[in-house]
Amino acid sequence: GATERAGFGSADLRGEFPSLVTCDISGYGAEGPYRDVPAYDFLVQCESGVASVTGTSEEAARVGVSVCDLTAGLNAYGSILEAIITRMSSGYGDGIHVSLFDGMADWMNVARLHQQNYGRPPERMGLSHSLIAPYGAYPVGGGGNIVIAIQNDREWGRFASNVLGDKLLVSDSRFINNAARVKNRGEMDAIIKNVFEKYNLSNLCKILLDERIAFGRLNDALALSQHPQLRTIPLKLPDGEVLEIIAPPSRFDSGDSVLGPVPSLGEHSEQIRREFK
């Protein structure tokens, strides 16, 4: 690419500075038949098969956030830290290659094994799960949706008896175990919806919490902004404007990281140049 032509390629830099750790991020990697194929997040979601397991039974869908870009960054971050730790004992840096495609292919391991073992791809079911029931979003009275994911028969027993209010459902042959519940998903979902629609969102959340049933609310960006668990921090832009953004996810006992202001274009260019003189 342009950096190599200018003499700033990763290999060139490590030749001059053997302890340097470099990381190249590309769409499909430095080798292979797709190495020169242009790549965007959406395109890689489709090429990797991620879009094929996302969406409804009628149509595949793009994941709503740029998962390829984000995953590539996280993979690069972890690999750079690994190389830095290795350098502490070896004294040498390393060259790292991360691609959007490899990151998503790694995510598809379970789907690929499903294809190999069952001879068919995982069934696409929106917010539901092809192998677990009940699992999905259910509307409640007054608006909103509750999502549940019953993981075992013991949890189903508490849910059926204490939330749905019908102990007979526990021993009902249609719902006696997960396989039966998956087979009779339609009948089971109808029962759940009928009960859930009798409650408003806050009342049902309290009942589920009291009964130790795992649940969530189907939130949008506005609801996330108002979430009581959400942490935010101020961030100063180059023009002096201050935005409230979501805080970094990792927290340390020694104290949370303090973010400095967003740098202006070229603000640290000279400082970086001096490091390589």
Question: Whereabouts are the PLM-identified features?
Answer:
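Active-site-adjacent "lid/gating" segments in soluble enzymes
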Residues: 4-150
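Alpha-helical scaffold segments in soluble metabolic enzymes
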Residues: 76-83, 158, 162, 271
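Short, surface-exposed loop/helix-turn segments at secondary-structure junctions
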Residues: 115-123, 227-238
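Aromatic-enriched alpha-helical interface/lid elements that frame and gate functional surfaces
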Residues: 134-211, 215
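Short acidic-hydrophobic surface loop/beta-edge motif
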Residues: 136-141, 233-239
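Conserved PLP cofactor-binding pocket of PLP-dependent enzymes
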Residues: 209-232
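Flexible, small-/acidic-enriched active-site or ligand-binding loops
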Residues: 235-277
